[in-house]
C-alpha cells in the first residue's frame, strides 16, 4: 500500500532523532479565514490539524507538490505465454519534506541548516527495497531534486495570508527538501497501492 511508503519514510526520519512528530501526508488547505496552510487529515471527526507547531521538539511533514504521473513502461512488458502479458507501470510522486528542528539541539554553526538538509537527504535516498517488497512493487526509489534553507522563502511557499513569526521561525533550522518517489510495478500493484489509501 502507498501508506507503507509514507510510514517507512516517516520512521526513517524519526530515527534521526530530530523530530517528535512526522506528519506523513499533508495538503495545503484553505481555512475558513481565507488563509492557506499545510494541514494533516486526522479523521472524519477530527478533521484537519495544523502541522506547523513550532513549540514542538522538532516537527516535519511531507506533502505532494504536484500531480502524480503514471506511465506505462512498454520496455518492461513481459510475455509469460503467447496470451499472457504483464504491463509494468511507473508512478512518480512529487513530494516535499518540510522540517523545523530547534537550533538549540544542533551544532552551533552558520551552516546548521545545510548540515540538517544533508543528513535528511541521505535518509530520503536510502535503500527502499523493504518498502517495495511490502507494497508488492518491483522497486521504490526516492531521489532528491533540491532543497531550500531560506526561512522566508519556505514560509511563503507553504503559507498564504499567514504572517511569518520571526521570533519562532529563526530559532529553528527550517528546511524544505523536494524529492520524487518512483514506484515501479505491474498495474495490479498500482491498483493495490492506491486502493483505500491516500
Where are the predicted features?
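Small/polar-rich, solvent-exposed N-terminal microdomains that initiate assembly or binding
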Residues: 1-83, 136, 198
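Extracellular/virion structural assembly segments
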Residues: 84-92, 98-131
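Polar/charged alpha-helical tracts
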Residues: 11, 20, 32-35, 46, ...
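Short N-terminal helix-initiation segments at or just after the protein's N-terminus
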Residues: 19-43, 114-122, 174-188
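A short hydrophobic beta-strand element
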Residues: 62-73, 95, 171-181
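Short, charged interaction patches at domain edges and termini
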Residues: 1-15, 84-88, 136-198
Amino acid at each position: 500500500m502507498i501508506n507503507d511508503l509514507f510510514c517507512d519514510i516517516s520512521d526513517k526520519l524519526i530515527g534521526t532523532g530530530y523530530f517528535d512528530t512526522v506528519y506523513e501526508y499533508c495538503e495545503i488547505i484553505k481555512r475558513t479565514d481565507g488563509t492557506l496552510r499545510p494541514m494533516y487529515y486526522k479523521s472524519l471527526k477530527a478533521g484537519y490539524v495544523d502541522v506547523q507547531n513550532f513549540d514542538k521538539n522538532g516537527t516535519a511533514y511531507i506533502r505532494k507538490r504536484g500531480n502524480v504521473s503514471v506511465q506505462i513502461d512498454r520496455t518492461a512488458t513481459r510475455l509469460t505465454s503467447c496470451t499472457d502479458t504483464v504491463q509494468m507501470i511507473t508512478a512518480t510522486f512529487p513530494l516535499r519534506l518540510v522540517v523545523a528542528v530547534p537550533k538549540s539541539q544542533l551544532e552551533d554553526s552558520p551552516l546548521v541548516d545545510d548540515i540538517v538538509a544533508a543528513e535528511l537527504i541521505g535518509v530520503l535516498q536510502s535503500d527502499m527495497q523493504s518498502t517495495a517488497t511490502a507494497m508488492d512493487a518491483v522497486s521504490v526509489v526516492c531521489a532528491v531534486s533540491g532543497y531550500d534553507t531560506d526561512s522566508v522563502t519556505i514560509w511563503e511557499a507553504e503559507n498564504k495570508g499567514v504572517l511569518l513569526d520571526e521570533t519562532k521561525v529563526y530559532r529553528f533550522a527550517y528546511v524544505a527538501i523536494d524529492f520524487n518517489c518512483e514506484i515501479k510495478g505491474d498495474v495490479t500493484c498500482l491498483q493495490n497501492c492506491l486502493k483505500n489509501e491516500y
